[in-house]
Amino acid sequence: MQKYINEARQLLALAIPVILAQIAQTAMGFVDTVMAGGYSATDMAAVAIGTSIWLPAILFGHGLLLALTPVIAQLNGSGRRERIAHQVRQGFWLAGFVSLLIMLVLWNAGYIIRAMDNIDPALADKAVGYLRALLWGAPGYLFFQVARNQCEGLAKTKPGMVMGFIGLLVNIPVNYVFIYGHFGMPELGGVGCGVATAAVYWVMFVAMLSYVKNARSMRDIRNQQHSGKPDTAVMKRLVQLGLPIALALFFEVTLFAVVALLVSPLGIVDVAGHQIALNFSSLMFVLPLSLSAAVTIRVGYRLGQGSTLDAQTAARTGLMVGVCMATVTAIFTVSFREQIALLYNDNPQVITLAAHLMLLAAVYQISDSIQVIGSGILRGYKDTRSIFFITFTAYWVLGLPSGYILALTDLVVQPMGPAGFWIGFIIGLTSAAIMMMLRMRYLQRLPSAIILQRAAR
């Protein structure tokens, strides 16, 4: 029991700064929406539309680079720190190539926006302008993630937290300058949010790079002499590890986007109630998501040390802590669901629906916690391909079709509206959780030599 308590302490020490960093990042999006809304409703809508396209694109790049964390954690655990600098340099090359691809996609996103049904031309122009300003921040964001993943792979999660709050503090005044046109800058409205956020991502990258360059604990990594040229073999391996993670993130984001589109014809009350429950659930999701990142670090580090038993301890501890957290948040959600809904809206019908959906959200949180921590464990084992297949099957083969049938058809019961989609979420996430656990058990039962050989690739 003592080893699990010690492991839980180390996991929480890693996870808490990640939680705070995620809160800072979420707050940046909230600040953009509120400040754009203060300028005009059209500008706020433009930021919302632009963000709905930006998120899947940038999260794809983000997921691709998540491969660096277990790679660095295992090199650190095995005492092969002399190889870390080369991996990080190739991460920067990969981030550069991916950011160019993302920028190209976002520059041409106007075709998607203008193809939306009955969209106001002025709104479309503002959304395109916002994206074309924001896309210049894509390289800064991805370069920042490379440096952050380096730190997290070395079990240093506090720098990412500090840089997240620096970004938030810089974002507010820079937003103000570019939205309203102060200090000689043009008045850009919602487009100014894109300019400000892009600038903030570069500030965060420069600040993180400065930390990495000057941190005493990384002196031996900085002093390593390696060629700075692209290494196709290393980048190919990073892509092989990262692409399944990127696609899994993409599937998850697009699933919720598709459900939002399917709910939209049902009416304002249904859309509002669904959005309130989803927004609150996404806030609660920060906890298991951050714990998942910590579990990846601990499992990777233990495998690097050559101890499959300690890796199992880290995995089991992460799951236990995650289920405890999810149980607490589920009880909180059930107990205060009406008060939570009132924070968003005062329409009685919306509050009633949102409170009902939050009962389903409470169940959803437990399944979600298990599956996202399971994903973190599999990343630690470098078993990322299974994450892709599990996510695709659970979300798109099981979750979405069952949700659609329950919500909009009478094949099983009378159409349930948004609640049907939420039952679909529960089916999908529970299926993902079960499959993640089965895959984890399969990996852990392999001979230690095979586990360590797979992890060292």
Curated annotation (Swiss-Prot):
Keywords tagged on the record: Antiport, Cell inner membrane, Cell membrane, Ion transport, Membrane, Sodium, Sodium transport, Transmembrane, Transmembrane helix, Transport
Main location per the UniProt record: membrane
GO biological process: sodium ion transport; xenobiotic transmembrane transport
Protein's UniProt keywords contain Transmembrane helix: yes
Transmembrane segments annotated in the record for this chain: 11-31, 53-73, 93-113, 127-147, 160-180, 188-208, 243-263, 276-296, 314-334, 350-370, 387-407, 418-438
GO cellular component, one term: plasma membrane
Keyword Metal-binding listed: no
Membrane topology: Multi-pass membrane protein
Compartment(s): Cell inner membrane
Family the entry assigns: Belongs to the multi antimicrobial extrusion (MATE) (TC 2.A.66.1) family. MdtK subfamily.
Protein name per Swiss-Prot or TrEMBL: Multidrug resistance protein MdtK
Gene source species: Escherichia fergusonii (strain ATCC 35469 / DSM 13698 / CCUG 18766 / IAM 14443 / JCM 21226 / LMG 7866 / NBRC 102419 / NCTC 12128 / CDC 0568-73)
